[in-house]
């Protein structure tokens, strides 16, 4: 169920891929509806690292997402009868942004999505259309200001800067529990968010993670 954007011009349009309906609610409220669309990924995502194309193209989560992206797939097989062959001109978005919780489960879901994209539409990664939205790990509040730390090192620097002031520190909640204002500031507003552009070399790290995860099971 895509929550679309108002803008028709591809050069600014962004697709946020989020995990589940709970995240959909907060991201929907935080987005700029003019150019940001949101699609939730529901249920367990297929691990495309090992799955054959027959299984991949029977997975509704994957086929729905590919249809929303719009450019088809770079796979020559009779298994993808409902999806067109790849044509970059049909891509509907300037940025495809994966937005998951800042925890182990969120990292795993992100890895599964990246692996799926690299298996079916590697050109999108090679040409720089795929991004990850960083979510803060900590929210640090003093009497007059709120800070967001995206890792332990940033948390240490912020606490050092605060010095002897009283502060409250909270570890990040799931995206669905965050207020829309915080989501906009830290994850969606182009002026203040942090996006990581995915490079082809990053996929090797994703593959290593998935192999390790499968080994532990």
Give short role names for the model-derived ranges.
Residues 5-217:
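Conserved phosphate-chemistry cores used by DNA topoisomerases
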């Amino acid at each position: 169920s895509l929550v679309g954007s108002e803008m028709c011009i591809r050069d600014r349009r962004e697709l946020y891929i989020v995990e589940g309906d709970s995240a959909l609610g907060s991201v929907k409220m935080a987005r700029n509806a003019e150019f940001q669309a949101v699609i939730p990924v529901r249920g367990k995502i297929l691990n495309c690292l090992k799955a054959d194309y027959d299984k991949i193209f029977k997975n509704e989560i994957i086929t729905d997402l590919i249809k929303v992206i719009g450019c088809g797939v770079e796979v020559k097989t009779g298994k993808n009868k409902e999806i067109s062959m790849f044509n970059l001109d049909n891509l509907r978005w300037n940025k495809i942004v994966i937005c998951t919780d800042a925890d182990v489960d969120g990292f795993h879901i992100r890895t599964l999505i990246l692996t799926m994209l690299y298996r079916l539409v590697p050109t999108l990664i090679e040409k720089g259309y795929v991004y990850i939205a960083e979510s803060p790990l900590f929210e640090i509040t003093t009497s007059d200001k709120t800070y967001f730390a995206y890792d332990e090192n940033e948390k240490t620097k912020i606490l050092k800067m605060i010095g002897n002031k009283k502060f409250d520190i909270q570890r990040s909640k799931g995206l669905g529990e965050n207020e829309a204002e915080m989501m906009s500031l830290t994850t969606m507003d182009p002026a203040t968010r942090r996006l990581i552009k995915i490079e082809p070399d990053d996929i090797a790290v994703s593959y290593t993670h998935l192999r390790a995860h499968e080994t532990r099971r």
